[in-house]
Amino acid sequence: MLALDAAPDGLVLVGGDGTLSGILDVVCAAGVPVTVVPAGTGNDLARALGLPLTDVAAAVELALTGLPRPIDIGEVRTSTGTSLFLTVAALAFDARVSDRTNRLRWPSGALRYYLALLIELVRLRPLDFTIRADDGPAIPARGTLVAVGNTASYGGGMPVCVGAVPDDGTLDVVAVGPLGRVRLVRLFPVLLRGRHLARPEVHHLRARTVTVAAPGLVAYADGERVGEETCTISVRAAALTVMTDAERRDAHVR
């Protein structure tokens, strides 16, 4: 990045979660505070930090008036390499929907996502996961999806890892047990309200590192495909400093 060649005191980054995660390794290595100007479709990091979502001037102003806030980032390691992410790593069903959406050439916009969702619902099959959290044993679990969150939401505000905050040094892991098509569809409205953790088919834990493996597993993070089959997801605590609104910070910390 040419901006880093000048040894700046800070960076202003314009983009969505996927754009930002794509340059995380360079930005973190620079060790300077970052001002995020949300310009993506989801902007879930900005939601988690209470940043202005639609007021560009207010977002840029934080470069001068904001409070530096160290936040965690996530790391996904697979057989093909290592990727960094800011929000949520999604594995199994919802990752397959994202994968299908990216492969479809028709229709466009939201209709393409809904068509992908319909196709994957028809093809829905629970997976036989193996999940290991931190130094615990590898636990077999049959299920539909697993989400590992540095923040509470992904996809523009869907609170799959409700309660997760990006500065506690841990990741929130949410696993949904084996569900049929009808039960999975019925779970979505509950998830959108952030009430799914109380359901018996939903399991929640916190960990610094979690390894998830399953035949045919696909993983996405910040909207980008990051691996398959076996994924080890870890937290890098306080790896990035973001300029935030001091008046709104306390409302976004657990």
Labelled PLM ranges:
Residues 133-135, 140, 165, 175-254:
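ATP/nucleoside-binding phosphotransfer catalytic cores, i.e., glycine-rich phosphate-binding loops
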Residues 1-14, 21, 29, 57-61, ...:
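ATP/NTP phosphate-donor binding region
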Residues 28-33, 39-144:
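Catalytic core of DAGKc-family lipid kinases
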Residues 94-97, 139-141, 153-157, 181-184:
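Short acidic/glycine-rich loop or secondary-structure boundary segments that cap or lie
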Residues 104-112, 154-156, 161-183:
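Gly/Ser/Thr-rich active-site loops/lids in small-molecule metabolic enzymes
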Residues 90, 94, 147-160, 225:
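Glycine-rich phosphate/pyrophosphate-binding beta-alpha loops
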